[in-house]
Every structure is written in C-alpha cells, then in structure tokens.
C-alpha cells in the first residue's frame, strides 16, 4: 500500500482554502482547531485526526478521495475550479 504524502495533502487543502477565499484563521475556526495546527496541516508537518480530516473535507467541499488519491468527482466544485484554473494557466504558457 502506498504511503500517504502529508505535504501533498496539505498543499491540496491550502489550494481549496484559497479557492474559497478563506484565511487559515477562518478555516481553523470552522474546523475547531488552532491556527497553528492548521498551518502544520497545510505544511504536512503534523498528522490530523480523522475528525479533523472529515471536518476539512466538509468545510472545503472536497472529497477524501481527492485528498488521499487524486480522484476528482464531478460533485467537487472547488476542485473543478482549481483544476480548470490550472488548465487555463497551462494553456496560456504555450
């Protein structure tokens, strides 16, 4: 079984948070965790509990599949916006 890349998960959480226009402080309050811990999660330097993981997925409207295995579902509007932004930027560089 593949080992989880917590830094990659943290980057995805940060991207989804920024897509919503939220600060770390706002997301940490919504998930009932400290601002410091939120920063550690986004940097991948601390492992979150399952409760925190679920809260982040719910608040950010992203699936656990995406965070863990890069599977994007059509019901993840934030992820689709992020992906569309990446495609647009990639096309503009060529």
Feature map (PLM): residue ranges:
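A detector for short, charged/polar N-terminal pre-domain segments
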Residues: 1-8
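Short amphipathic helical patch at the helix-1/turn junction of helix-turn-helix
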Residues: 7, 18-19, 47
